[in-house]
């Protein structure tokens, strides 16, 4: 690339370099283009810090470390694309290292999202840009959903999402967080749009992913997915791994939609130390296997042991392995007058105080 050689211009570039000494500015495409064209330097690089767009972004996206420098790019591109509509200059920018995705591209795509610029998206699509890659640590679809939910313009958000999906953005595991965010808005238009875009198989995968990865599961989102006809007893090949971890409201919901509770569900709940679910399952008639009862007692899971007592679980055949030395010691203590009740109580109390309540 040939750099414009005028001495006065070179001095301006040098001044800009040291005045804005930061990697994001120096490595930006607009800076590289400015080195070849003095008009770009005067019109865009030195554009004053007045763009309202930068203040919008300050509230929504930026981290403290790089805020000023990305604002600078936002101001420059806001003037170029939104105010001047200089698409010819944007074409020149795309010619600079077009295979290298940079901070500039994040800023430009962010502007395209906020100002409904499908013409800008189309330029990226022509260049072969992957619409499923991350910008600002999330997907383009996610940015659209969150932005248009924030400003309550759902129809516009849906139009943009539809355009991008038609041009290669996929609803896959890479965008599951996007769909959950859409469902989490509880906006009927967003929810209906994405439900119509997802196959039953992908919907089952989405449900599995959500239940496995989210700590605070929104039961309304779960019901939204369940109500769309997925096979609740076979929605994912590993769904059985999750059921024993359900909380009681989620289990109630699944049962209401036809979940068949197999014998191993209560065993899994015991294994995970999920005593609230174990209590619920015992109350409706399920009982753990002898092997799990033995494991619970061996590991002194006091909360589950209490439930065995509460529901009169027969423990007469349960004999956890104990070394002959320990058996002899207990018998000796008993023969010396120490109550066996005291021994059991002491051991359980010690495990309780040390927090060993789970298998």
From Swiss-Prot:
Keyword flag DNA-binding: no
Positions annotated as ANK repeat: 72-103, 105-133, 142-173, 203-234, 236-260, 261-287, 288-317
Matching InterPro entries: Ankyrin_rpt-contain_sf
Keyword Nucleotide-binding: no
Annotated protein name in UniProt: Putative ankyrin repeat protein R190
Keywords annotated in UniProt: ANK repeat, Repeat
Organism: Acanthamoeba polyphaga mimivirus (APMV)
Lineage top rank: taxon: Viruses
């Amino acid at each position: 690339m040939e750099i414009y050689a005028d001495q006065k211009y070179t001095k301006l570039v040098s001044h800009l370099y040291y005045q804005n000494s930061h990697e994001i500015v120096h490595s930006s495409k607009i800076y590289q283009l400015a080195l070849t064209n003095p008009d770009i330097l005067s019109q865009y690089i030195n554009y004053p810090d007045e763009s309202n767009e930068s203040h919008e972004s300050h509230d929504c996206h930026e981290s403290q470390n790089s805020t000023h420098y990305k604002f600078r790019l936002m101001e420059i591109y806001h003037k170029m694309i939104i105010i001047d509509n200089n698409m010819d200059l944007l074409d020149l920018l795309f010619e600079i290292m077009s295979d290298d995705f940079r901070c500039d591209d994040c800023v430009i795509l962010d502007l395209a999202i906020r100002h409904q610029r499908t013409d800008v998206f189309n330029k990226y699509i022509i260049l072969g840009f992957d619409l499923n890659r991350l910008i600002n640590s999330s997907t383009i679809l996610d940015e659209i959903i969150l932005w248009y939910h924030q400003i309550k313009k759902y129809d516009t958000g849906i139009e943009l999402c539809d355009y991008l999906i038609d041009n290669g953005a996929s609803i896959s595991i890479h965008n599951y967080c996007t769909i959950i965010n859409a469902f989490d808005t509880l906006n009927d238009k967003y929810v209906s749009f994405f439900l119509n875009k997802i196959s039953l198989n992908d919907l089952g995968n989405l449900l599995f992913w959500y239940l496995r990865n989210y700590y605070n599961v929104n039961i309304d989102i779960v019901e939204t997915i369940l109500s769309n006809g997925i096979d609740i007893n076979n929605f994912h090949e590993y769904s059985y791994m999750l059921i024993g971890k359900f909380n009681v409201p989620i289990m109630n919901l699944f049962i209401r939609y036809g979940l068949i509770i197999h014998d191993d569900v209560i065993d899994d709940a015991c294994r995970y130390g999920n005593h609230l679910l174990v209590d619920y399952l015992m109350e409706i008639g399920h009982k753990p296997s002898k092997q799990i009862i033995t494991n619970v007692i061996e590991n002194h899971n006091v909360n589950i042991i209490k439930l065995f007592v509460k529901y009169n679980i027969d423990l007469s055949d349960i004999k956890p392995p104990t070394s002959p030395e320990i058996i002899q010691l207990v018998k000796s203590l008993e023969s010396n007058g120490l109550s066996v009740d005291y021994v059991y109580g002491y051991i359980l109390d010690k495990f309780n105080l040390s927090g060993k309540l789970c298998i």
